[in-house]
Amino acid sequence: GGSSGLISMPRV
């Protein structure tokens, strides 16, 4: 799970 700019990635 990490965020970069306006894109967020859930821990899946």
UniProtKB/Swiss-Prot annotation:
Transmembrane segments: none annotated. The keyword Secreted applies. Pfam families: Periviscerokin. It is found in: Secreted. Keywords: Amidation, Neuropeptide, Secreted. InterPro entries: Periviscerokinin. Abdominal perisympathetic organs. GO terms for cellular component: extracellular region. The modification Valine amide is found at residue 12. Its main location: secreted. It comes from the Eukaryota. GO terms for biological process: neuropeptide signaling pathway. Belongs to the periviscerokinin family. Mediates visceral muscle contractile activity (myotropic activity). This is Periviscerokinin-2.1. It comes from Pseudoderopeltis foveolata (Cockroach). The lineage of its organism: Eukaryota, Metazoa, Ecdysozoa, Arthropoda, Hexapoda.
